[in-house]
């Protein structure tokens, strides 16, 4: 299957993923973004070869080396919005607690809400830690999204080149060429202290739990 075909399939699937969870409207934050009533995932899938996540009940196979709580971050190169490369362990928040939010595509409503929530509802954590979003969107698309959404407190990193991040962490969905939906909290020593991979792609991760874990790491430090 060619790369172009995979990207087309991925775009079609991503649109479906985004629309599936967004039937009922929620309230507005006053920032211009209207939150929707999207299910928050209960529990976590497991990463890596042989594991699956669901899309509307249908399994999609994960690819790559599994990551789990207690593992150290594996160094991979990602592309920043200025097209420069950076290692995932060498971002501007190096030496700090970080929340890494992983989304299939920012051009879908579920991913959009996940990213707004990370940016707007982190309870002041953005002043103390680094917030990161990783997706296979191009750096140009990520930059456009951040500007249009007026999100300046999140570091956007693109895995578009060869899904190196997805494969290194067992979060790569090879068929549609996207990443599974996940959130991880990483301590100052690059150890994963919290990881949730949503079992159903149309559900949001529990960012409130991620915020709680991040705050506890700051307090303990």
What are the functions of these language-model segments?
Residues 2-79:
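N-terminal targeting signals for export/organelle localization
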Residues 72, 97, 178-180:
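Short, small/polar residue-rich loop motifs at catalytic or cofactor-binding pockets
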Residues 80-82, 186-187:
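Short, acidic, Ser/Thr-enriched surface-loop or helix-capping motifs
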Residues 87-118, 130:
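Short active-site neighborhood of thiol/selenol oxidoreductases, capturing the structured segment around
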Residues 112-151, 156, 163-165:
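Structural microenvironment flanking redox-active thiols in thiol-disulfide oxidoreductases
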Residues 154, 173-184:
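Structural micro-motif
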Residues 167-173:
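Short, basic/aromatic recognition patches
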Residues 180-221:
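Thiol-/selenol-based redox modules, centered on thioredoxin-like
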